[in-house]
Each structure stands twice: as C-alpha cells, then as structure tokens.
Regions:
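Hydrophobic structural segments
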Residues: 1-130
Length: 130
C-alpha cells in the first residue's frame, strides 16, 4: 500500500482542519512510498522507532506529535532528536493525529464519554466552522 493512500484515509478519519492551531498533526517525517507495515502508538519515542525497525514497519501512526515545536538543532542530544534521526535514517514515516482526532465528534473524547456512560455531552469550546 502507498503512503499517500494511508494518509488520505487518516485525513478522512481525522481531518487536519480539525486540529488546533498550536498543534502539529499529519505527516511529520517521510521519505518512503511503499508501506511495509504500520505501528500504532501513543508517542513516537525512540523505543517505538526501534520497535518499528525490528518489526519492519516503515510507518508509525502516533497520537502525540514527536515534533511539537520547532527543532533548533538536530544533534541527537535528546529523545526527540534521536527519534527523528532514527526514523529518517531508517526511512520511517511518522504521522500524528492528536487534536484532529480529539476534536472529531466521534473521536477520543466521545469514546471516553461512552466508556464512562456519560449522557448529554457536548463540546465545551467548539472549534469554529465545524
């Protein structure tokens, strides 16, 4: 399967327009086209990238973006830099859904509300135009 097909599906599931302005969602790293395997995780930490390498997965779909605010340097001195370097060196794409999924009407918050048996729920601060 092609990366573009998977990102198209993910963007239908959690449209990037739903994300908060401060967030960094979507395709964060990519130098690949044919996807050999997908690893899904909460945070794309260095250990997750190691697992993706071991399992021959070249796409990591994570909830939180590993690149949240701009990197000023990439020296490998912290876990973010090491994870990004390792992903790029091993041709692993990283895709984050974070607030795009948070803000979806059937997303993370609805799942939690349903699991807790809550009724009459509503979005406290709805995103404009949705």
């Amino acid at each position: 399967m092609q990366l573009s097909e998977i990102t198209k599906y993910l963007e239908q599931l959690a449209p990037l327009a739903y994300a908060e302005d401060f967030d960094n969602v979507g395709l964060l790293t990519s130098h690949t086209n044919d996807i050999t395997g997908i690893l899904v995780c909460h945070d794309a930490l260095e250990e997750v990238i190691d697992e993706a390498i071991a399992k021959k997965c070249n796409l990591v779909v994570c909830f939180h973006p590993i690149l949240f605010s701009g990197l000023k340097k990439i020296t490998g001195k912290n876990y973010v830099e090491r994870a990004v370097i390792k992903a790029i060196k091993n041709d692993i794409a990283i895709y984050s859904v974070h607030t795009a999924l948070d803000n979806h009407q059937n997303g993370v918050n609805k799942i939690f509300c349903d699991a807790l048996g809550l009724i009459n729920t509503k979005v406290l601060i709805p995103k404009q135009n949705f």
